[in-house]
């Protein structure tokens, strides 16, 4: 009887482990606007984009193939001094990685060849592209570093912390 009980407990335990190890693909039903708004909310008054991007910007500036995009919401600052921008794309099923690669290339191009005010270089360099499944975000956001005596390293660290606010808000939507 004892051997049967031990055997049953072992079988039940193995069954539980097998059930836990099955990877379930979590699906989300956010619009690009939902994700955009969550990131915007995380920044509060430090969210500077106040104008919408248009399809020409999506395709020319960012190189997006709109046939791979199901939904998109993007904003940019209308004051040219600030580089702040947020682009959130919900790619068509299975196209998330492709959209991510395209936005990474656009980011790299902006970092390497963009004409930026020196005060904005840290923010531009700290920008990130993040992805969760078929949702992708290009994040170049954050408070303005008002310190006039900040070293290059301090400015870079401040900018990284500011961009991370958006990354964390994005990731929070997709945590299991």
Regions found by a protein language model. Give the residues of each.
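C-terminal motif of bacterial Sec signal peptides marking the signal peptidase cleavage site
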Residues: 15-19
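Repetitive helical segments and hydrophobic/amphipathic motifs
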Residues: 11-12
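Positively charged n-region of N-terminal signal peptides that target proteins for export
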Residues: 1-8
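Soluble, non-membrane globular domain cores that form compact, hydrophobic packing
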Residues: 21-85, 91-176
């Amino acid at each position: 009887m004892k051997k049967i009980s031990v055997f049953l407990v072992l079988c039940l335990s193995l069954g539980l482990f097998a059930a836990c190890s099955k990877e379930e693909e979590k699906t989300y039903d956010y619009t690009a606007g939902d994700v955009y708004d969550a990131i915007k909310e995380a920044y509060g008054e430090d969210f500077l984009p106040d104008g919408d991007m248009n399809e020409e910007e999506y395709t020319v500036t960012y190189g997006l193939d709109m046939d791979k995009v199901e939904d998109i919401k993007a904003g940019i600052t209308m004051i040219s001094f600030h580089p702040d921008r947020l682009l959130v794309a919900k790619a068509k099923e299975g196209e998330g990685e492709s959209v991510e690669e395209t936005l990474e290339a656009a980011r790299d191009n902006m970092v390497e060849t963009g004409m930026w005010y020196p005060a904005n270089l840290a923010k531009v360099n700290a920008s990130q592209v993040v992805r969760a499944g078929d949702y992708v975000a290009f994040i170049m956001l954050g408070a303005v570093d008002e310190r006039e005596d900040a070293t290059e390293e301090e400015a870079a660290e401040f900018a990284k912390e500011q961009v991370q606010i958006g990354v964390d808000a994005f990731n929070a939507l997709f945590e299991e």
